[in-house]
Design a protein with these regions (language model features):
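N-terminal secretory signal peptides that target proteins for export/translocation
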Residues: 1-15
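Beta-strand-rich extracellular passenger or scaffold domains
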Residues: 19-22, 26-161
Length: 161
């Protein structure tokens, strides 16, 4: 008696695996290039962060509507950070303020190629009162035709790349 069960869609031969790979590869190309993954965080509207938050994905501020994010002596770390970025033909003016000596906004700076970007589209990043914003690469003006601003004020405020 054979106790193993086999699903009717199970791939049983190497040739079937090849067909499955050829069939599924174009499906990946049909999805939008800029879709949110489950690990991504989206801050639309007004938000205030006073704690440490880490994301194993990207952070979007102002993705579906205007975003206004205040990091008040809190910390956000994510793979990439996008402020006021064009999505699905729409762009919303957004502001991120990082305020206080313990406040940080960090895009992960590691050896992986697709991590570490801080992108400003139609957005403003304000670093105030001793706060820190850091990324492997900071791009101000990612979207042609829209204004972006990066402002650091106050003693000890830092922007590093």
């Amino acid at each position: 008696m054979n106790n193993s069960t086999s699903h009717s869609l199970a791939v049983k031969t190497p040739l079937s695996r090849l067909y499955l790979a050829l069939f599924s590869a174009p499906l990946l190309l049909l999805s939008p290039a800029d879709f949110a993954r489950a690990a991504d965080a989206i801050f639309d509207g007004d938000s205030r962060i006073t704690e440490t938050l880490g994301y194993t994905g990207d952070v979007y501020v102002g993705r579906n509507q205007r975003g206004n994010l205040l990091i008040d002596n809190g910390k956000i770390t994510a793979y990439n950070i996008n402020i006021g970025r064009l999505f699905d033909g729409q762009i919303y003016e957004s502001v991120v303020t990082v305020r206080g000596p313990n406040a940080e906004l960090n895009a992960v700076n590691d050896q992986y190629v697709l991590r570490g970007d801080l992108n400003l589209g139609l957005g403003t990043l304000r670093v105030e009162e001793g706060a820190l914003a850091s990324a492997k690469e900071i791009v101000v003006g990612t979207t042609r035709g829209y204004d972006s601003h990066l402002i650091a004020t106050g003693a000890g405020s830092r922007v590093t790349s």
